[in-house]
């Protein structure tokens, strides 16, 4: 029947890769592949493959894809709930990513509370409100970036609970602006410690791709944020709690 007809051919090396003057009889057979095509099917199937790689000369064919894909760590999952993309991604790396997602969301939540406080009509420091709103958005974007990476590596995103932040940042001695900025610096340093821990997990699991992701996307940016907020704290300490805070706020606003 036409639907069951087969077309077959044998593929053998057509070009010798041996050095000039060396007889091909001195080298073992490299590869012989037979392919069968079902005219009613959807592809080509490799029916057989005979490869002797142990005695293969260095000038011969080195990469044998049909043999190497048989390795256990390259096996493709057949269950629907298993990731097809996952490769060399340790469970501890997956868990550490989920923890970092939680860190970023928690810091974003605190900054959002600061934004709401400084936007009050009886506080009215619009520059600080703007700064902490932007900081909150940035931390949320970091969390989403980690979530995207988790999915790229074939991990499962698990969102952990977020702690409710305080809503008032008044401080009798320091004033609200300096107090909030010092708290922000502590949060940025804490985030940096968490990122370094994530990088350490990647190194322990021999995962250069995760290590590169943390280095290229977060570590440099983190020290820039620490320096920026440190400068703000120094300036706020110089101006004190009075009228100078308003001028500092205008600097952030404009």
Swiss-Prot record:
CDD domains: Euk_Ferritin. Pfam families: Ferritin. Residues 48-86 are annotated as: Extension peptide (EP). Belongs to the ferritin family. Stores iron in a soluble, non-toxic, readily available form. Important for iron homeostasis. Has ferroxidase activity. Iron is taken up in the ferrous form and deposited as ferric hydroxides after oxidation. Oligomer of 24 subunits. There are two types of subunits: L (light) chain and H (heavy) chain. The major chain can be light or heavy, depending on the species and tissue type. The functional molecule forms a roughly spherical shell with a diameter of 12 nm and contains a central cavity into which the insoluble mineral iron core is deposited. This is Ferritin-1, chloroplastic. The lineage of its organism: Eukaryota, Viridiplantae, Streptophyta, Embryophyta, Tracheophyta.
């Amino acid at each position: 029947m036409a639907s069951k007809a087969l077309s077959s051919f044998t593929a053998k090396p057509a070009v010798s890769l041996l050095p000039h003057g060396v007889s091909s009889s001195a080298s073992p057979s490299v590869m012989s592949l037979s392919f069968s095509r079902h005219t009613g099917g959807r592809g080509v199937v490799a029916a057989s493959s005979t490869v002797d790689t142990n005695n293969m000369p260095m000038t011969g064919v080195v990469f044998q894809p049909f043999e190497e894909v048989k390795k256990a760590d390259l096996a493709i999952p057949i269950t629907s709930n298993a990731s097809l993309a996952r490769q060399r991604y340790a469970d501890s790396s997956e868990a550490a990513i989920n923890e970092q997602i939680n860190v970023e969301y928690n810091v974003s939540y605190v900054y959002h509370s600061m934004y709401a406080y400084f936007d009050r009509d009886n506080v009215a420091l619009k520059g600080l409100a703007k700064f902490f709103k932007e900081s909150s958005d940035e931390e949320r974007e970091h969390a989403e970036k980690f979530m995207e990476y988790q999915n790229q590596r074939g991990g499962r995103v698990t969102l952990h609970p977020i702690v409710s932040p305080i809503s008032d940042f008044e401080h009798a001695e320091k004033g609200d602006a300096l107090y909030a900025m010092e708290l922000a610096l502590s949060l940025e340093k804490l985030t940096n410690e968490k990122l370094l821990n994530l990088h350490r997990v990647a190194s322990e699991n021999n995962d250069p791709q995760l290590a590169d992701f943390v280095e290229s996307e977060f570590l440099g940016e983190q020290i820039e944020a620490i320096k920026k907020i440190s400068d703000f704290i120094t300036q706020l300490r110089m101006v004190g709690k009075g009228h100078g805070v308003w001028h500092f706020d205008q600097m952030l606003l404009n």
